[in-house]
């Protein structure tokens, strides 16, 4: 038994169906089937864990609020205390192409609500949920906040985001870097041929908009693939490719093409068929006089055939030594890519 049978004889999904949700950039349902029994649970659980923990994203790491020394402070004219403001800042969704850290600033006077859309971004930073409310200002109140944004993966607690040389007033924030917000999956039975107990894996995915759900699954699968490579302790035997030996022909391979493959009128094609002319090799050996003696074959059909043959560099009345070959049907199949 060859080692390849361990994986080559397992059934693999013949399709991956992606159904976008109401917001195609954030929601989607993916269905993979058929899978070997048990593989739906295995793949679904592994992909879900990687999707939630291991994809790269961007998030706020810390914030500095003018006039605030620590997160247990309050700000005159701001209805929320700093603790609530920090909790709201955690929910800001960000897309950033380059490497961090980078800065964002928001500055606003009351009365009114400060939203994520008020943040002044620079470079390649995009705020994905601009309607998110950060705080509410009374008349005459003013606030200025400076955010530090960075890239990472998974969840990082606020204490880990505090630099050793953090200045007074720098407030670290819990960072949820993962662009994937929710993942659920279910496994059902599906049918393949006469077998009814294969697995059907359905995954429902929600992202923050920094990545599409199907791209997120693709990256997660690539991460798993890369991590599993270390467990493969062998090289696959190379398949021996035997090159087919094409025999030399004593005539043009185009003669092996059937005349019904030519673009002829129905009348001309029927006349050739009734005269038992099957291959071009049969046709080119005929003279014009012989063709005109064919029942229902007239000058118009003759001119049509002469024109088609001329386009191939052929003509009527040719001599074809060795025609027809004994194994003509076999040769026609072997040379079908050569004419």
Curated annotation (Swiss-Prot):
Gene3D superfamilies: 5' to 3' exonuclease, C-terminal subdomain, DNA-directed RNA polymerase, insert domain, RNA polymerase, RBP11-like subunit. CDD domains: RNAP_alpha_NTD. SMART domains: RPOLD. Its EC number is 2.7.7.6. It comes from the Bacteria. The keyword Transferase applies. Keywords: DNA-directed RNA polymerase, Nucleotidyltransferase, Transcription, Transferase. It is an enzyme of class 2 (transferase). GO terms for cellular component: cytoplasm; DNA-directed RNA polymerase complex. Signal peptide: none annotated. InterPro entries: DNA-dir_RNA_pol_insert, DNA-dir_RNA_pol_RpoA/D/Rpb3, DNA-dir_RpoA, RBP11-like, RNAP_asu_C, RNApol_insert_sf. GO terms for molecular function: DNA binding; DNA-directed RNA polymerase activity; protein dimerization activity. SUPFAM superfamilies: C-terminal domain of RNA polymerase alpha subunit, Insert subdomain of RNA polymerase alpha subunit, RBP11-like subunits of RNA polymerase. Residues 1-235 are annotated as: Alpha N-terminal domain (alpha-NTD). The N-terminal domain is essential for RNAP assembly and basal transcription, whereas the C-terminal domain is involved in interaction with transcriptional regulators and with upstream promoter elements. Belongs to the RNA polymerase alpha chain family. DNA-dependent RNA polymerase catalyzes the transcription of DNA into RNA using the four ribonucleoside triphosphates as substrates. Homodimer. The RNAP catalytic core consists of 2 alpha, 1 beta, 1 beta' and 1 omega subunit. When a sigma factor is associated with the core the holoenzyme is formed, which can initiate transcription. This is DNA-directed RNA polymerase subunit alpha. It comes from Rhodopseudomonas palustris (strain BisA53).
